[in-house]
Amino acid sequence: MRRLPEQLLHPARRRAAIAALQARRAPTSVLVLCNGNIYRSPFAAAALRRALGGPEGTVAVDSAGFQGPGRESPKEAVEAAARRGIDLTGHRSQLVTPDVVRGAELIVVMEAEQRRAVRERFGRSPRDVILLGDLDPEPITSRSIVDPWGRRATVCAASFGRIERCIGALVKALRHAPADRAA
């Protein structure tokens, strides 16, 4: 019963998120954030880079988190990502800072609380921060993309699957965004 509002609101939130992305100028830089920058955001950033055409594409994609820098992605994250063709072996977590946030035209987060934190702590406009789960093309039970930290490997695999679906929708929306419209 608790998740019913999320399910009912999702279609409208999805339409609004896609419309907002398509109404803005296509970004040249994207920052993907999650709590620790060891599971969701590094995977999402790598998936976005791949979907946009690789690391040398026209859009710079980076990731960061709200907790300690310099940490490796856990074994289960590396393995789950590898099964999806993404290499996280060299990833080290990066702490989100004002400079990192300032350098991004679009910020993608995994949870509503993170969206709020970016807006409050770093003064970013709501239009610059998108909740990735709002783009999910499938019915949902939660806007947030589940944090696999401390959970079974199956949770990591499911989170990565949802991230890939949402990244596909994000890329599709960005490809329909005007290249020359003012941000």
Regions found by a protein language model. Give the residues of each.
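Conserved active-site segments centered on acidic
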Residues: 5-103, 173-182
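Phosphate-binding/catalytic loops
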Residues: 1-16, 116-183
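Short beta-strand scaffold positions
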Residues: 32, 109-110
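Conserved residues at the C-terminal ends of beta-strands
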Residues: 67, 110, 132
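Short, flexible active-site-adjacent loop segments at beta-strand->alpha-helix junctions, enriched
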Residues: 36, 92, 114, 135-136
